[in-house]
Structures are given as structure tokens and as C-alpha cells.
Amino acid sequence: MDNKLNIVIITGMSGAGKTVAIQSFEDMGYFTVDNMPPNLIEKFVGLLNTPDNKIDKVALVVDMRSRAFFEDIQSIVTELTDNTSVNFKLLFLDANDTELVSRYKETRRSHPLAIDGRTLDGITKEREILADLKNLSEVVIDTSELTPRNLRARILQKFATSTESTFRIEVMSFGFKYGLPLDADLVFDVRFLPNPHYISELRDKNGTDQEVYDYVMEHPQSEEFYQNLMKMLVPILPAYKKEGKSVLTIAFGCTGGQHRSVAFAERVSAALREKWHLNVSHRDKDRRKETVNRS
């Protein structure tokens, strides 16, 4: 098993997509640092490259914002390439001049090397400075025709080490009376199912308790809904992954988030966990109990 520290330096033309790139690495579980001064990289790597360090993947953005320090980058890249105690890759992001000018016009920002606001002059100068560094890069991606989503997918394709690190599913339950979860991608309302709240011996239990789970699932409409739901979910999950989505949140809601939604979140997560990296949570499961305790 390779226990070496994995280091990726992200560099390239200003406006070529380094922000999207570093976010992509963060989604893959990398420790990320934006705008890292090149003269600090050696010391930073030394701090991480120790037996008791728990960080095993690092992605650093180094670009022309470092200005005076940038001249150190080539020698540092050479040192990291020759360092047998780390796994090192250099990622260079590029785009054609027309596209870069267009992106700067769209964002209304100034190129770091532009003189008197002349963006194209700044791009030309930067391209000359980075020419040797581009030649040293193990991975070069031209983003001229790529959307942010396409770029993210390309990076995942080239750098991801496992399916678990590139796509995961969050299944959650919630109560509509406490509001919709803001981060949910898919929301399913299960308030049409019989409510255990009206069964006295089930009222103070929740959907993780076997009695409540069985009560919810024993009704024919529960089984019909579950079967139809899985027929929909199974084919669309690979499509979400293919589009480069890192987290898909599937939420089930009932009135208070204690019984029906919890039971369904448990059942669906158990089925999907066989194939997908998945986490299940119950936002409002204990909210009623907490309210009673505070009163």
C-alpha cells in the first residue's frame, strides 16, 4: 500500500479555471490551499510529510498572483518531481486568448499582468512566462470549450482514485413543519402515508424503531411508492455522477420528521448503500423530544 503524500500543484493561465479546479480537488478529499507562495511550498510539504500526519492528499494553486515569488516555482517543481517520498503531479490549465479575453470581459476583472487595462497584453506576457512550466506539466487541460461542470468532470476523471471520493449520496429525513432542507436536490413528500403519530404506543418512538418502521412499511401504498421510487432512482444516479456532481442529497419529508420520513430514509439508504457511498441523517427525528425537555 502506497502511504506517500500525494501533492498536486495547480497552475496555468489566469482565467483558465483554477478556482473550479481547486474546488474539484476539495470535493475529492484533498486539503487545498489557494494562492500558495512558491517559496513556502517546501516548508509546507515538510510539515505534512511526517509519519504522524493524517493529511495524505494536498492540492495547491500557484499562479501569477504570487508575482515576485513566482520565479521560484520551476525549481520547486523539479525538486518535488525528484522527491521519491511523495507522489507529485503538476496540473496546467490553459485556454486560448480569445476565450480568456472574453472571460475577463464577463467578470470585469483585471488581468494580474495587464498594463493600463490591456488584457490581451497581460495574457501574452503571462503565456511567455508560463511556457516552460507548461512543458513540465504532467497534465495539461485546455478549458477553452469546457463549462465549469465539464472541467470538473475532466479533473475527476484524471485524478480521482475511487468512485467513493467522486460521488456520494446523502439521504435525509425532515419535518415540513420545520422547513425544507436548503441543500436537498430531490425532495419526496411521504405525508400521504398513514401516520404513526396517531397510534399511542408509537407516538414517542421514531422511524428507526422496528415497530414504527414495520407500521409504515406494511401499508400497500408504502410498498407501491417504494418500488416506483427505486425504479426512478436507480437509472438517474449514474447520470448525476457522470455530470460531475459530488454530492446528491435525497430528502424525505413528513409532518414532524419523526416517523414516516425517517422510516423511508432508512429503507432507501439501505438499498442504495449496496452500490453507492452513502450517508443517512435525520434532521428532525429528536426535535419533539428536545422541545419537551426544554419546556
UniProtKB/Swiss-Prot annotation:
<dbReference type="GO" id="GO:0005525">
    <property type="term" value="F:GTP binding"/>
</dbReference>
<feature type="binding site">
    <location>
        <begin position="12"/>
        <end position="19"/>
    </location>
    <ligand>
        <name>ATP</name>
    </ligand>
</feature>
<protein>
    <recommendedName>
        <fullName>Nucleotide-binding protein LACR_1047</fullName>
    </recommendedName>
</protein>
<feature type="binding site">
    <location>
        <begin position="63"/>
        <end position="66"/>
    </location>
    <ligand>
        <name>GTP</name>
    </ligand>
</feature>
<keyword id="KW-0547">Nucleotide-binding</keyword>
<dbReference type="InterPro" id="IPR027417">
    <property type="entry name" value="P-loop_NTPase"/>
</dbReference>
<dbReference type="GO" id="GO:0005524">
    <property type="term" value="F:ATP binding"/>
</dbReference>
<dbReference type="Pfam" id="PF22740">
    <property type="entry name" value="PapZ_C"/>
</dbReference>
<comment type="similarity">
    <text>Belongs to the RapZ-like family.</text>
</comment>
<dbReference type="InterPro" id="IPR005337">
    <property type="entry name" value="RapZ-like"/>
</dbReference>
<dbReference type="InterPro" id="IPR053931">
    <property type="entry name" value="RapZ_C"/>
</dbReference>
<comment type="function">
    <text>Displays ATPase and GTPase activities.</text>
</comment>
<dbReference type="InterPro" id="IPR053930">
    <property type="entry name" value="RapZ-like_N"/>
</dbReference>
<keyword id="KW-0342">GTP-binding</keyword>
<keyword id="KW-0067">ATP-binding</keyword>
<dbReference type="Pfam" id="PF03668">
    <property type="entry name" value="RapZ-like_N"/>
</dbReference>
